């Protein structure tokens, strides 16, 4: 975990991926730093301090989700994104709001499990190599077939067999040492062997996914899992592939799942972040039965946000110290349309601004994962070096901004559409082009995009 970052350092890290939106970055940076501060307090005071939940308000495509996602990734905290519109009131068919907490715990378990696997990786690989040696050179017990029970009982021919057994053991030991040496040198990587692996079975949980009955599926699966033995099947694989499978199996045996569960539940409770998107879609004044149902979802979310215990397959999980970040465009409604109790649970309000053409220019070139860097790297795999002139980048940004103004404003996501259309022909013909370097000029951008951008009816369908 990396909770030691100062708010300024967190903002600097977020700047590497997200352009603008300083207020939102500052809000999440302070929220993260407060978690670090809280961890330093004495226990009785620490229990009294709950995180201040954040409500992000802004149009689509301005970075609401990205800010929260990058924030969680930065500190390695369990993070999930859910959509408020996917939930239904308790008693109706669909997902209940408690499933977001169960999903968070599942994410936390996966993170902790991956960390534990890395810790035991060397030992797991060592044991996997021993299993490979055993498969390639079986021990005498496995090689020998039927033994005369009378001979075993009365020790007949015991003396005469001892010498031959000792010689056989020596020969096998030499073979095993030779195979170990070859495995270490990587000389047997392509050798095909037959191994037994644990069969992956489709779970009850998978069948009930999205029906609102996931918890029942998980409980049923656990009950069956403790009774039914695990199935194995034989597979023919190269030594290289077999080592990966066997290493994974050995790692799963080496890690203590009780320890994983305990740490995962702790992280979910103390460090977990739940991002609730589209919260504006469940806001609104009561006017019909649909709105009543939306208010019901808000009332179901309320106890989760203010702190309650949720039953999961890993035990009861407290939601008191989970950080909730809600977001919405609030085009058709406003934050005050949420029920007052829920409004009070999101004391930090942050408004994200619309993106300008200048912001689009920065988005195209400045972030570590900038779009132009992505497309340049993709086409470089075909042996083509692509260069965008500054004027061409400005032209792309202006066209994307103008299309947003003329049609629906989808923020930075418009750049993906524009870039795909711009490089469509080039991407299609890349494997056949003999030129080593191609420069994208404003004229090329104009030729590919300007006509479509100017025609409002066409741009609605293409851009």
Swiss-Prot record:
CDD domains per UniProt: RecA-like_HslU
Q: Which organism is it from?
A: Bacillus mycoides (strain KBAB4) (Bacillus weihenstephanensis)
What gene codes for this chain? hslU
An example of a Pfam family matching this protein is: ClpB_D2-small
Its biological purpose is as follows: ATPase subunit of a proteasome-like degradation complex; this subunit has chaperone activity. The binding of ATP and its subsequent hydrolysis by HslU are essential for unfolding of protein substrates subsequently hydrolyzed by HslV. HslU recognizes the N-terminal part of its protein substrates and unfolds these before they are guided to HslV for hydrolysis.
Entry binding sites for ATP:
19, 61-66, 277, 341, 413
The primary site where this protein sits is: cytoplasm
InterPro entries in alphabetical order: AAA+_ATPase, ATP-dep_Clp_protease_ClpX, ATPase_AAA_core, Clp_ATPase_C, HslU, P-loop_NTPase
State the residue spans of region: Disordered.
154-175
Its protein name is ATP-dependent protease ATPase subunit HslU
Record-stated family = Belongs to the ClpX chaperone family. HslU subfamily.
Q: Keywords of this protein's UniProt record, alphabetized?
A: ATP-binding, Chaperone, Cytoplasm, Nucleotide-binding, Stress response
* Example GO biological process: protein unfolding
